[in-house]
Structures are given as structure tokens and as C-alpha cells.
Amino acid sequence: MLDLLKISVTGDPSSGKTEACQVFEELGAFVISADKVSHSFLVPYTSEGQRVVDLLGPEIIVENTLNRKAIAKKVFGNRDLLLSLEKILHPGVCRFVEENYTQVVQAQKYSLFVVEVPLLYEIQYADWFDRVILISADTEIRKERFLKKTGGSDTSFDLRCARFSSLEEKILRADVVIENNGTKEEFRHKVKQCFKALKGTI
């Protein structure tokens, strides 16, 4: 049985990673969002959730779940707390991804295995994947998207971006770079072309 190509989609905040993954999923790929997996741990009764409460305090518990806005307020702008939070969540995310890969290969029904990992290089996870796709967009365009989607502030955008390594460094390391400065239709077309190229390498 041939192994399924492992693809990571990464990029800076609001670059278009999720949209790219949606296109891949529409075309028959199995897709995992690392952020969604980490968010699933943010409940008090998981081992990760309890460690997050121990780290940040019981005030982050709201209606029997861990309030992501309260967590963000505490960790963005405090690098030590942010790194400690990542050390709690990321091992579980990687474990989930790798366990799912084994199951998806056995299912033999998907064209690619795609994982959206925003902090791929920052957590040293790139080597596990066969290909890395970097989604790139100008800072002002990304900021506009972020503000429109979240209703957040320029400061909250800047604080999130501060955790990411430089775009130039990631461009040098990625296998494929897809620019997303134009329309949604233009971007989706580029992702579809990328999918075809990846399928051609199998």
C-alpha cells in the first residue's frame, strides 16, 4: 500500500491558510486544522486543559470551558506564558495528527493528507511532512482581513504576528509558495493548480 502524501499548509495570520485547506478538502483531501485540535483541548476535564488552568489561573474557565479570549489576553504580549501554553498543547496536536494519518492511510479513500499548521517552522514540525505549502500575503492585506473577521485591533493583530518567524525565512524553506494578494477566485484557482501538481508527484 502506497503511503499518502503528507502536506502542511502554513503561513502568517490571515494569509489564507484555511481557505486553501477548504479547497483541498473539496478536491478530496483529508484535512486537519491544528488550531481546531488545540482548541478541543481547552476544556477543564482534559489533561491539557487542567495544565492550562494551572498555568493561567481558574478565571479563564467560563461556563465549563476555557475562554479563548481570556487566554489570548493573558498570553499575547507575554512570550514566556505563550511558549509555556504551546508546550502544553502542541505535543497533543502532533500526536493527534500522526494517529489520524495512520487511520487515513488505511482507509484508502483520500487523495492527500493535509494539515493546517500556522506555527509549523516555529515548533520544528516541518520535517514530518513530505511537502510544505506556504500561503503568503502582504501585511496590510492580512491586517485588513484580520480586523474584518475578528473585530480585533491593530495591536491584537501585531501581537499575534510577533510569534511568527520572518516570511523571508519561510519562503526559503517552503516547497511551494502561493501568493494571496488578489481575489478569492484567483487564490482558489492557484490552490487547485497546486493540488493538480501535487497529485502528479504521487
UniProtKB/Swiss-Prot annotation:
It comes from the Bacteria. Residues 6-202 form the DPCK domain. It catalyses: 3'-dephospho-CoA + ATP = ADP + CoA + H(+). Pfam families: CoaE (PF01121). InterPro entries: Depp_CoAkinase, P-loop_NTPase. GO terms for biological process: coenzyme A biosynthetic process. Its EC number is 2.7.1.24. The keyword Nucleotide-binding applies. One of its GO terms (cellular component) is cytoplasm. Belongs to the CoaE family. HAMAP family: Dephospho_CoA_kinase. Catalyzes the phosphorylation of the 3'-hydroxyl group of dephosphocoenzyme A to form coenzyme A. PANTHER family: BIFUNCTIONAL COENZYME A SYNTHASE-RELATED, DEPHOSPHO-COA KINASE-RELATED. This is Dephospho-CoA kinase. It comes from Chlamydia muridarum (strain MoPn / Nigg).
